Amino acid sequence: LADTGTTTYTILVPRPSSGPERKAAEDLAEWLGQMTGATFTIVTESGADLPEGPFISIGQTRLLKDYPLPLPGTDLGRDGYAIWASDPHLFITGGKRRGIINGAYSLLQEDLGCRWYIPGVDPVIPHRPTLTFRPVTRAYRPIFEDRRDPYYSDVAYDADWSLRNRTYALTATVPAAYGGYPRFWPSFVHTYDALVPPSKYFA
């Protein structure tokens, strides 16, 4: 992806692109830039022709038609993701809610060694001006859709931290560009009154 602080790779997003697709692209550009010192430009598909590659393809780009995921029948759901490489391109795709962002951070953490341990503490971003690696082809769908950490501290209120660690912040407002906030019931606690209204069931 980079050679002595420079790169030939461009981050490609579809037109139109969703908020999570743009967020995944922007975060990849930021952290890959910090890691390598290179500038990873984000471009949007336009017209019939693609700009020159090689690409890091994010989301449902037209490039996928020529380089499909080599794991047929994969169901990524809303939060799942897939990562694979097909020379010379790298592909990250995922579900429409949080999946594509989860894929971007899976690459940064599991393939490239980045870490975000605790809010307020500097992240661990390896310094790799020359960045060569072989990504593991994979598709993953979280077993649990509700992945909130019930630990009341800065973690509970930090949407960025939860995004980078592929969870949902306990009480933070999660922007639509981050995939929003899943709601399975009216609130996190004190729900019986709403789920089983006394006026209906105990009148």
Task: State the predicted function of each range.
Residues 1-82, 125-138:
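Acidic, contiguous N-terminal accessory segments
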Residues 16, 24-27, 31, 71-203:
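Feature activates predominantly on carbohydrate-active enzymes
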